[in-house]
Amino acid sequence: MLDEGYESRIIDGKVLAKKIEDEVRSGVEALVSGRGITPGLATVLVGDDPASKMYVRLKHRACERVGIQAEDHFLPAETSQEELISLINTLNKDQNVHGILLQLPLPKHLFPQEAMEAIAPEKDADGFHPYNMGKLMIGDEGLVPCTPHGVIRALEEYNVPVKGKNVVIVGHSNVVGKPLAAMFLNRNATVSVCHVFTDDLKKYTLDADILVVATGVKHLIKADMVKEGAVIFDVGITKEKDGVYGDVDFENVIKKAALITPVPGGVGPLTVAMLMKHVLGCAETNY
């Protein structure tokens, strides 16, 4: 249980996600009435990984809420690379599909990077295509990865200044750490990127005005590793029999943080909401 008074420090991802979805719904309605275009998202799932199935369901439910037409493509686990690429090429040519999402991870015999590169950059709703990543690196933020986009949107929504601030990102994946570092640099923050192998991680995290943690290591960040008044985004998630945990020791760290995202209910809903925003943007821009 949280001590009384700490609730105001929580960045409620569900509330902000609803606001974003309301914006998307209005945009979809305007696109349908003004140009006769209904935004469409195609999801591609290979195999029967339970977590991946759940994530796809969440995205389809979000599509229903905002008026995006969603279609699902479930492929058996033994699908070949050629068959996967063939489906992606078909979706690239489908004018009713404005965004394509390849749900990861893929079965081990497949090559995810090659598959993602097969997606037309203008339909890359997840923002993972090298073309879109390259644009991000030179400051052209069109389609960017959804989780980093959600973090930036939350900072804007809570009026957290970024320019000149010390930002520390723990985790250097292509999905979160690297693109988010570029987005912070584009906003003139001073950025340090660390990971679980960084020597003396605490030395870096203690200096963070804004701390983003995305490692998947349960409670990696303790209260003595953050400074008073830091803004903290917990992107990691660890599922155990007794519950779901983030990378941050939430109950203790919140006592020092100015703002912090919970797990669950923090960054996750924002990621899905930003995906909806991206699909709308794809439809508005390319058709």
From Swiss-Prot:
Molecular function per GO: methenyltetrahydrofolate cyclohydrolase activity; methylenetetrahydrofolate dehydrogenase (NADP+) activity
Biological process annotations from GO: L-histidine biosynthetic process; methionine biosynthetic process; purine nucleotide biosynthetic process; tetrahydrofolate interconversion
Keyword Manganese recorded: no
Originating gene: folD
UniProt keyword Amino-acid biosynthesis present: yes
Keywords from the UniProt entry: Amino-acid biosynthesis, Histidine biosynthesis, Hydrolase, Methionine biosynthesis, Multifunctional enzyme, NADP, One-carbon metabolism, Oxidoreductase, Purine biosynthesis
Family listed: Belongs to the tetrahydrofolate dehydrogenase/cyclohydrolase family.
GO cellular component, one term: cytosol
EC number per UniProt: 1.5.1.5, 3.5.4.9
Pathway recorded for this protein: One-carbon metabolism; tetrahydrofolate interconversion
Database matches in CDD domains: NAD_bind_m-THF_DH_Cyclohyd
Positions annotated to bind NADP(+): G171, H172, S173, I237
Biological source species: Methanosarcina barkeri (strain Fusaro / DSM 804)
Function: Catalyzes the oxidation of 5,10-methylenetetrahydrofolate to 5,10-methenyltetrahydrofolate and then the hydrolysis of 5,10-methenyltetrahydrofolate to 10-formyltetrahydrofolate.
InterPro entries given in the database record: Aminoacid_DH-like_N_sf (IPR046346), NAD(P)-bd_dom_sf (IPR036291), THF_DH/CycHdrlase (IPR000672), THF_DH/CycHdrlase_cat_dom (IPR020630), THF_DH/CycHdrlase_CS (IPR020867), THF_DH/CycHdrlase_NAD-bd_dom (IPR020631)
Cited Gene3D superfamilies: Leucine Dehydrogenase, chain A, domain 1, NAD(P)-binding Rossmann-like Domain
Reaction(s) this enzyme catalyzes, per UniProt: (6R)-5,10-methylene-5,6,7,8-tetrahydrofolate + NADP(+) = (6R)-5,10-methenyltetrahydrofolate + NADPH; (6R)-5,10-methenyltetrahydrofolate + H2O = (6R)-10-formyltetrahydrofolate + H(+)
Complexes and interactors: Homodimer.
Protein name from the UniProt record: Bifunctional protein FolD
Entry-linked SUPFAM superfamilies: Aminoacid dehydrogenase-like, N-terminal domain, NAD(P)-binding Rossmann-fold domains
